[in-house]
Amino acid sequence: MESSRLRLLPLLGAALLLLLPLLGARAQEDAELQPRALDIYSAVDDASHEKELPRRQLRAPGAMLQIEALQEVLKKLKSKRIPIYEKKYGQVPMCDAGEQCAVRKGARIGKLCDCPRGTSCNSFLLKCL
């Protein structure tokens, strides 16, 4: 009985190895038939295809003004350029000696800048001394 199990085990393993490529090919065909979410959205930032909200869905009379104000803010944020010192972490612009500065630790009051060599930002006066 034990010898028949030992003979059957390699045969089952060989059959499984032969069937695996066939099962993998079928799964690959199924994956190719499914639509991809990336194909639905275009890479172009064109807002002309976006839907407008129907006016009956707007409940407040000032809602249109709020939407227009938000759209203006979004346009400004898109056009705003980030200063180089904000992009590079750990690097901030230099302050002049005696100018108001900000401490990097804790709550910060004042302009974010680093004091020149030989001076340090006084946390009480918030000036480069």
Swiss-Prot record:
CDD domains, alphabetized: CART_CTD-like
Annotated compartments: Secreted
Phosphoserine modification, residue list: S48
Phosphotyrosine: residues bearing it: Y41
N-terminal signal peptide: 1-27
Keyword Repeat tagged: no
Example of a GO cellular component annotation carried by this entry: extracellular space
One record GO biological process: negative regulation of bone resorption
SUPFAM superfamilies reported for this sequence: Satiety factor CART (cocaine and amphetamine regulated transcript)
Highest taxon of source: Eukaryota
UniProt xrefs under Pfam families: CART (PF06373)
Record InterPro entries: CART (IPR009106), CART_C_sf (IPR036722)
Cysteine disulfide links: C95-C113, C101-C121, C115-C128
Molecular function as annotated in GO: neuropeptide hormone activity
UniProt xrefs under Gene3D superfamilies: CART, C-terminal domain
Sorted UniProt keywords: Cleavage on pair of basic residues, Disulfide bond, Neuropeptide, Neurotransmitter, Phosphoprotein, Secreted, Signal
Function: Satiety factor closely associated with the actions of leptin and neuropeptide y; this anorectic peptide inhibits both normal and starvation-induced feeding and completely blocks the feeding response induced by neuropeptide Y and regulated by leptin in the hypothalamus.
Stated family: Belongs to the CART family.
Protein name according to UniProt: Cocaine- and amphetamine-regulated transcript protein
